[in-house]
Swiss-Prot record:
It is found in: Mitochondrion inner membrane. Performs an essential function in the generation of cytoplasmic iron-sulfur proteins by mediating export of Fe/S cluster precursors synthesized by NFS1 and other mitochondrial proteins. Not involved in the export of cyclic pyranopterin monophosphate (cPMP) from mitochondria into the cytosol. Expressed in roots, leaves, stems, flowers and siliques. It comes from Arabidopsis thaliana. Residues 437-671 form the ABC transporter domain. This is ABC transporter B family member 23, mitochondrial.
Length: 678
């Protein structure tokens, strides 16, 4: 019989590992992992990471040997409760009756599965006693159950099979019914995260690491399913099943068996808590190495051309391999500690099972118990082993899910420095009365020690065009970012038609401004989509007209797929001039009241530039335009030219007036003409 017990224990362990592998493969569709990582059950505990030097504002994992202070512990508890409250709200969506019905149906399937599962050891005991008995009277005496009065071994064994199959069917049905709830939750949270990231200011996105951010979002989204499943189908049912088994053993076989069960469960849980706490640092190291490797790979691929220019393929591979080595080392430590954890859990359960079997065998020899009783005790303990194994795994996965969710929630708690003010009354929209722009003693710096704008003041009259020229780093592009409110001033004001842009809604401000950036990055989609993006309500003919005004229509029509041509990652399938003209077409399609162009023609040849400047002049009619101009031939066609140097306005006037002053602009003009002559 002990061989049978060991066999059952082995089955429990195998079943547990198969389920772990199943979870791992279901998650692999979201994100690829190194093969050394076995399953989400390789785990970490929920701790409150200290700030990291990462540019993602420490929104990545790290490892530390420092201990937590009481305040940190309170923060961790509060964070865990907040996460669980948020996840719980998705279980019972008040505005979605279908999902609420699915939760109720899944719980009903859970109850049905547990009810049938409890019948299995009873039916198995009865069949053993029936087969061990030689007369119906003996059968009835040894089995004081109503079923024993009319049962036959075959019918009981058929019932045994039905109970096992029914329990499995209810479990699978529960999974199928509940899957839409978890998937809808993942969808809702993922959309919320993306929307929140778009709401954050430019400063945050300039400092972030795309690879690490992608990992945080992926792991956080996957953790939602883990935590939801644990809350509904693992934690409470496991506690219920442990209580039921302990009660049945105490009622049928005495308090000794109940005591053995209680001690083994307590030891199992305590051992799992202690060892998993120790394993926290390894999982955090894995997360950090995973983030770093992902960031390195993405950065290397994004800069594919630069890598090729300098023949640094081997260097990139070595750097990536070094980070993978860090991940491998941390994963190896995780695997070793997991093996120790699994062995300890198996040892505790094996000890409890062996002790119970010895007591049963003594009871049989003393005539106090039947062979069926031994089988029933074995079955109940084996039945208890599965939730115990799952309790450890679910606990580890849930805690790891909390770690991943906390990082995701920290991302959601990021607040933008740029946005509509939090006031009791909503900010009014911008009221356009022509589109005049004024800077009033504006100071700004990206870093305290580096001044970008140093008290600049100027005005662009409504419907006029102004060119801003100057050497690199003089603050020209920053001015455009200030107008669009990518950044706010350190002091001073920026006004449009006399209205402080901080005192109007961002949506109304940005809806009336068109921007052609210096570095044009296109979506990995068709040319039509990239132009149409400027005004999603525009018709096809309006898109074609915008392309004609940007002098790109004829070029597009020569492509095999015409407007359906894919531009590739970041528009790399197009030349620099083609990308810039697509960006111009996009701005033309928006047809804004204010147009901001940051060296919009610097990648164009002289002929194309002349054609586009004609279009600009027609577009600029009755519109306020600001051009950041590297080519002074572009600047000379504007109504006024502003010359900047070291964050200050040093000259203002028309092209002819500035040439007559023989100042900074005149020198720039002479330098460019000399270069052209050479």
């Amino acid at each position: 019989m002990m061989r049978g017990s060991r066999f059952l224990l082995s089955r429990a362990s195998l079943y547990h590992r198969l389920r772990s592998d199943h979870h791992h493969h279901s998650f692999s569709s979201f994100i690829k992992r190194s093969s050394i990582q076995r399953s989400p059950a390789i785990n970490a505990f929920f701790t409150d990471p200290s700030p990291s030097p990462s540019p993602v504002n420490a929104r990545v994992f790290f490892f530390s040997t420092s201990t937590s202070t009481p305040n940190q512990d309170q923060t961790k508890t509060a964070s865990s409760k907040k996460i669980l409250r948020t996840i719980s709200s998705y279980l019972w969506m008040k505005d979605n009756p279908e999902l609420r019905f699915r939760v109720i149906a899944a719980l009903a399937c859970l109850i049905g599965a547990k009810f049938l599962n409890v019948q299995v050891p009873f039916l198995f005991k009865l069949s053993i006693d029936l087969l061990s008995s030689y007369s119906s009277s003996t059968i009835t005496d040894s089995n004081p159950y109503l079923l024993a009065a009319f049962a036959t071994p075959s019918s009981v064994l058929i019932g045994y099979g039905i109970a096992r199959s029914g329990s499995s069917a209810f479990n699978e049905l529960r999974t199928a019914v509940f899957s839409k709830v978890s998937l809808r939750t993942i969808r809702s949270v993922s959309r919320k995260v993306l929307s929140h990231l778009h709401d954050l200011d430019l400063r945050y996105h300039l400092n972030r690491e795309t690879g690490a951010l992608n990992r945080i979002i992926d792991r956080g989204s996957r953790a939602i399913n883990t935590i939801l499943s644990a809350m509904v189908f693992n934690v409470v049912p496991t506690i219920l099943e442990i209580s039921m088994v302990t009660g049945i053993l105490a009622y049928n076989f005495g308090p000794v068996f109940a005591l053995i069960t209680s001690l083994s469960v307590g030891s199992y849980i305590a051992f799992t808590l202690v060892v998993t706490q120790y394993r926290t640092k390894f999982r955090k190291a894995m997360n950090q190495a995973d983030n770093d490797a992902s960031t390195r790979a993405i950065d290397s691929l994004v800069n594919y051309e630069t890598v090729k220019y300098f023949n640094n393929e081997d260097y990139e591979a070595r750097k990536y391999d070094d980070l993978l080595g860090r991940y491998e080392d941390a994963a190896l430590q995780t695997q070793k500690s997991l093996a120790f954890l699994d062995f300890g859990q198996s040892f505790i359960f094996s000890t409890a099972l062996s002790t119970s079997m010895v007591l049963c065998s003594q009871g049989i020899m003393n005539g106090e118990m039947t062979v069926g009783d031994l089988v029933m005790v074995n079955g109940l303990l084996f039945q208890l082993s599965l939730p115990l194994y799952f309790l450890g795994g679910v606990y580890r996965e849930t805690v790891q899910g909390l770690v991943d969710m906390k990082s995701l929630f920290q991302l959601l708690e990021e607040r933008s420095d740029i946005g509509d003010k939090d006031t009791e009354t909503k900010l009014p929209p911008l009221v356009l009365r022509g589109g005049s722009i004024s800077f009033e003693n504006v100071h700004f710096s990206y870093l305290p020690e580096r001044k970008i704008l140093d008290g600049i003041s100027f005005e662009v009259p409504a419907g006029k065009s102004v060119a801003i020229v100057g050497s690199s780093g003089s603050g020209k592009s920053t001015i455009l970012r200030m107008i669009f409110r990518f950044f706010d001033t350190d002091s001073g004001n920026v006004r449009i038609d006399g209205q402080d842009i901080k005192e109007v809604t961002l949506e109304s401000l940005r809806s009336c401004i068109g921007v052609v950036p210096q570095d044009t990055v296109l979506f990995n989609d068709t040319i039509f989509h990239n132009i149409h993006y400027g005004n999603l309500s525009a018709t096809e003919e309006e898109v074609y007209d915008a392309a004609r005004r940007a002098v790109i229509h004829d070029t597009i029509m020569k492509f095999p797929d015409k407007y359906s041509t894919a531009v590739g990652e970041r528009g790399l399938m197009l030349s620099g001039g083609e990308k810039q003209r697509v960006a111009l077409a996009r701005a033309f399609l928006k047809s804004p009241a204010i147009l901001l162009c940051d060296e919009a023609t610097n990648a164009l040849d002289s002929k194309t530039e002349a054609e586009i400047m004609k279009t600009f002049r027609s577009l600029a009619s009755n519109r306020t335009c600001i051009f950041i101009a590297h080519r002074l031939t572009t600047a000379m066609q504007c109504d006024e030219i502003i010359v900047m140097e070291k964050g200050k306005v040093v000259e203002k006037g028309t092209h002819q007036v500035l040439l007559e002053k023989s100042g900074r602009y005149a020198k720039l003009w002479t330098q460019q003409n000399s270069t052209l002559e050479v």
